[in-house]
Amino acid sequence: MKEFPKNYNFIESEKKWQKIWQEKQIYAYDENIAKDETFVVDTPPPTVSGQLHIGHVYSYTQTDFIVRFQRMMGKNIFYPMGFDDNGLPTERLVEKQRQVKAYNMGREELINICNEVVASEEEKFRSLFNQIALSVDWNLEYQTISPLSRKISQMSFLDLVKKGEVYRNNQPILWDPVDGTALAQADIEDKEKTSFMNYITFKTEANDEFTIATTRPELLPACVAVFYHPDDKRYQHLAGKFAVTPLFNVKVPLLADPLVQQDKGTGLVMCCTFGDQTDITWWKTHNLPLNTIITKKGTIDFPHEIGIDGLKIKEARAKIIDILKEQELFVKQEEITQTVKCAERSGAPLEVLTVPQWFVKTISHKDELLKRANELNWHPKNMKIRLDNWINAISWDWCISRQRYFGVPFPVWYSKRIGEEGKILYADISQLPVDPLKDLPIGYSKYEVEPDLDVMDTWATSSVSPQLSTWGISDEFAVNKDRHGKLFPMDLRPQAHEIIRTWAFYTILKAHLHQNTLPWKNIMVSGWCLAEDRSKMSKSKGNVLVPEKLLEQYGSDVIRYWSANSKLGADTAYSEDVMKNGKRLVNKLWNAAKFVSQHFDKLSDEDKKTNLIDVKEKITHEFDQWIINKLVELVNNATNELQNYEYANAMHLTEKFFWSVFCDNYLEISKTRAYDEENKNPSGQYSSVLTLYHVMQTLLKLFAPFMPHITEELYQILYSENSIHIKGNWINYGNLNYKIDAKQPERLLEILDHVRKFKAEKNLSIKAEVQLLEVSGIELSKELTSDLKNVTSAKEVKFKPTNDEIKVSILT
């Protein structure tokens, strides 16, 4: 055993061990070990455009608890770290940091700047993840924009093309006019906004007036029909007739459709191409003409004497209303609250435009995906309903093309050869990764093709995050077929609950389409980290906690302790009180270890090296045997909780045992025997010290997944020069159990509680001498009575046998 330092300096210790773990490759994956002995993690690649905050620490450490446990259980761990550095989020970061606009820059210039920025941001993440002791193997690091990732992402696309699961079509899509790109259904959020319902006068061909209500009068030039509900008796007389639009005098059909809400507005609604998804449905169902007036920039494209051409949406709306009023065609306006579909990132209200895009078939697979969700092991189980609800709500195929620059390009060109104009040309697998702006399809010159200018949705690459690590998509499309087969499907996907509808869903979809399987066996879903007042952290509120400051103040182990105190999947508020409890626990571990260590030289070197099971006969004292039984019970329960991903329960059980059973009671009761200054009870002393030795060692191992630095420091001082975190270093006591009457030691604790309470009430020191301790009830054994005398400082203990509950009288 090394000399025990006077104090614990967490800053020095944490830096020291982080360096040693890296140098000694404690967390390295061994590719030569069989698949069934390996635990494979699909680590969330953080979006490097995001601000580093305490939420990163919160969620990533919860994964690390499970990984460290699995490693100590003997598993070969595949625990990579990736960085999601491609796509629109990175472009927006660059625009903000460099005060530029992507559409004002050359494509190549923007890409170069993006690469510079992400390299800098990734280094910040690496530093933080090392500081909080994530036990990842950094040799497995990947970036979603790297050549290898681009190759695998393009393989995914080509595999889906070959399977007929991808198509390109010129159809209505959701468009963000601020970021200038198409979006998928999962990229939008519904926002409640104040708006106005405008009542406008229409006429029939016969000059009969009627009123429609709309929130978007600027779309009048795009009106292609007017609808009413077939059961609405007010308007059944309009069947087969035509309406004439105000201001523009365009004849449009009056049609019946069950999607009309009779109690909304007047029950008559105009269909424009396009205001919302209902317009798309009507356009398709009734084979209506396409009349597009909104541009990609969110302005009106409608040269007309009315003068709205080139105006922004809101400007055009105001002008149309003014003109309707002038011509006495405006009936009234009502303020309403409506749900508006907005872009999740820019926040802009979306438009529906008809622009050619790439799509992954999704709607046709909804039933299959619901079955996949059932096959998956959810931790916690109640998170599954979120995926079920999302799948049931899907109404669009997944649009995977984006009109941006910094992303994975489509391996696609369009032929300009005579006779095959517009033919889609795909790259050969041998060419990947390709940039169609620089590369050419086999057999074609640059004059014969037009490159696809779009890039893939960042989720199109993130959705194959398992495959980015396994280096393959399928048997046919793989960089390393053996590696892919060995690692896929994976064991665990950890992630936050708000991206179930995106990352979880898309990854399940891709694995299902590529290999007809789940991507992983288990999904572990974390909640949000909230501010102390339980509000969501945001820069605008000024309540975002910066991890670096907390690490300086408390250290990594304390922050990890706070994270471990949150139930899986629960939103948890940051708590100074919990942090202080964590600091107190670190100090108590140090002091408890320091206390027990002074006795370890009383043990033989052989017994120190021997497993508890093989020296169990040397633990002879009844109270020592009792705590060993309790310890075995703790190990079994904590192991079971960790195997079920309930790390918080495991932490709670271990901490409760450490404080209540070990520190408050066992140490106090057994320390007189451990000292045995008069050498009255050598066997009792040896039994006590051997018990202290193994209980402390076991507790360090139980705490190790949660608090890796303090446990490593103490373990190497007290027990071994090998890391506590090495593979196979978990505790296994098998069926170890001492045949004792557990009621006797527990009775001792109950009596001790009475004595402590008495002394506290009398303002006596806990060590104050007791002349006579008289106890009614069942008599304790000789061994336990001796312990009772020692811990209560009683000169004499008498028992009065009765069947009543314990009563204690004390004479001081």
Swiss-Prot record:
The UniProt entry's sequence similarity note says: Belongs to the class-I aminoacyl-tRNA synthetase family. ValS type 2 subfamily.
Q: What is its main location?
A: cytoplasm
Q: What's the protein name?
A: Valine--tRNA ligase
| Keyword Transport attached | no
Q: Name one GO biological process term.
A: valyl-tRNA aminoacylation
Q: How does it assemble?
A: Monomer.
- What is the source species? Rickettsia bellii (strain OSU 85-389)
Q: Where in the cell is it found?
A: Cytoplasm
Chain location of the short sequence motif 'KMSKS' region per the record: 536-540
Report the EC number(s), separated by commas if there are several.
Answer: 6.1.1.9
Function field: Catalyzes the attachment of valine to tRNA(Val). As ValRS can inadvertently accommodate and process structurally similar amino acids such as threonine, to avoid such errors, it has a 'posttransfer' editing activity that hydrolyzes mischarged Thr-tRNA(Val) in a tRNA-dependent manner.
Matches recorded under Pfam families: Anticodon_1 (PF08264), tRNA-synt_1 (PF00133)
- UniProt keyword annotation of Protein biosynthesis present: yes
**PROSITE patterns, per the entry:** AA_TRNA_LIGASE_I
UniProt superkingdom: Bacteria
InterPro entries, per this entry?
aa-tRNA-synth_I_CS, aa-tRNA-synth_Ia, Anticodon_Ia_Val, M/V/L/I-tRNA-synth_anticd-bd, Rossmann-like_a/b/a_fold, tRNAsynth_Ia_anticodon-bd, Val/Leu/Ile-tRNA-synth_edit, Valine-tRNA_ligase_type_2
Reaction catalyzed: tRNA(Val) + L-valine + ATP = L-valyl-tRNA(Val) + AMP + diphosphate
UniProt keyword list? Aminoacyl-tRNA synthetase, ATP-binding, Cytoplasm, Ligase, Nucleotide-binding, Protein biosynthesis
